[in-house]
Design a protein with these regions (language model features):
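Short, contiguous pre-domain boundary segments
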Residues: 1-2
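Helix-adjacent hinge/juxtasegments
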Residues: 53-93
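Short, contiguous alpha-helical
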Residues: 5, 9-23, 28-66, 98-155
């Protein structure tokens, strides 16, 4: 497999791992927390849109489509399903219609940034996430679902 594609797949797995930690044990009403700009559910919807856009751009359709947020559990599911579809495309031999570097520097980097934003909002909402050493985390390409391995070195 192409090294660039494989690295982008590892990046998607990293995104899935970090987001799953951010969403894990979030209060039921966290998606509607307000007081810091967009609500978490709106941010998560945007993140799902970014991943769909990355997938579609890689397939040759770079048109942007913003969606209305779904309820929190469905929005989380939509994100991870979009991530799995994009990962499957990268794992295939289908030629990409966009440079891997651009897919990383645009939608994927943006989604990683928003993952950190959601983690900060968890703290603002009074429900901080537990820290861990992400360098030691058991992250592997293709592991892009919401179910992730347990932390190797939690704080």
């Amino acid at each position: 497999m192409d090294e660039k594609r494989e690295f982008l797949r590892h990046t998607l797995a990293t995104l899935a791992y970090r987001l799953s930690r951010t969403l894990q044990n979030a209060p039921i009403d966290f998606g509607d927390f307000s007081g810091a700009g967009r609500r978490p559910v709106e941010i998560l919807a945007h993140m799902g849109d970014l991943i769909v856009w990355a997938h579609n751009t890689a397939m040759g359709d770079p048109s942007w489509k913003a969606t209305r947020p779904l309820p929190w559990p469905q929005e989380s599911q939509r994100f991870f399903e979009a991530l799995a579809a994009f990962d499957a495309l990268l794992a295939s031999h289908t030629p990409l219609m966009a440079p891997v570097e651009n897919l990383f520097q645009g939608p994927i980097a943006d989604a990683l940034t928003h993952t950190g934003q959601l983690a900060m909002l968890r703290r603002f909402a009074g429900s901080p996430t537990r820290g861990e050493n992400f360098y030691a985390a058991a992250i592997a390409a293709g592991q892009v679902g919401s179910a992730q391995p347990a932390p190797v070195k939690p704080f």
